């Protein structure tokens, strides 16, 4: 897969931007704060319906505007599709493919496939469990877009159930019994949460089983002198670690039973304590968790291994994802830079952002790449980003 054209309107610092892209390596060069990361962030947003930098869509809309528009034309095995996304500062986003309006932006999942390396990847090891859950869910939704909808539905049911738990806890504290209306309704929400949660837990266990060997091999290539790396999924819904993975229905039954066991504690705390929203991905080096025990270099090697495993897993499915390297070379030592560059030779398209050319490995600067230069200009509406403003044409090397 490769992206043939990207068009932005009022996305962060870009009032307008249209750039034609080609297979191979494309480099966006610009000083920090000039807006080069915003370009690849827009592509990643269309791919995953989320930003790797912020949690709220309002930050993506240029100051003073009500909405932003991102259009990405992707070519996959000769078939061309254009994904359009209208991002609103307030209200629901809208999406379409070519000229067809979609019922939900979630229907865009799978149209554009990307794997992003960025400085924020350190959170995959050092961050909270939510970062690692998000990593797994992105991989799952890219491969099976339907499960992206399951995750969204689960989050909605979870919010409603947590609200009910707070109501039930307040009722008990006021002296009402277990037959109070709010409390009796929990059974219905438990069933819905377990049905959706069982599907998510099964999907995560399944993808971790596939990613595990890829992570191990990638880490061994990047850091052959280090301890072996492996990953494992840790769930609040226990099951016997057997060769054959339990079905979604079996996970659903196990989760429902666990919810029953924890009901009193959940009502007391007013929060759901069981389910995929409480799970984690253990990242292990040797016999110790990488978080807290890995050196800075080992942490970066593990983060790269997780992303490389993601890339190869999607590639094994039959489609080369677009590889995005966002200001990541500046964070790596020479050895890790070269290991990462070796992967770029395998990808159909690579998009790279860098503040200065010195951040790039020699093997990359010597290869044929398409270069674009990002600058800024001050206007009455504020500072805006410009692409190739000096000449008005792309710079190829």
UniProtKB/Swiss-Prot annotation:
UniProt keywords, alphabetically: ATP-binding, Cytoplasm, DNA damage, DNA repair, DNA replication, DNA-binding, Nucleotide-binding, SOS response
Record's subcellular location: Cytoplasm
GO cellular component, one term: cytoplasm
A Pfam family the protein falls into: SMC_N
Molecular function terms, GO-annotated: ATP binding; single-stranded DNA binding
Binding site for ATP: 30-37
GO BP: DNA replication; DNA synthesis involved in DNA repair; double-strand break repair; SOS response
Highest taxon above the source species: Bacteria
Keyword DNA damage: yes
Record PROSITE patterns: RECF_1 (PS00617), RECF_2 (PS00618)
Keyword DNA damage carried by entry: yes
Membership in a protein family: Belongs to the RecF family.
Function in brief: The RecF protein is involved in DNA metabolism; it is required for DNA replication and normal SOS inducibility. RecF binds preferentially to single-stranded, linear DNA. It also seems to bind ATP.
Protein name: DNA replication and repair protein RecF
Originating organism: Corynebacterium diphtheriae (strain ATCC 700971 / NCTC 13129 / Biotype gravis)
Gene name tied to this protein: recF
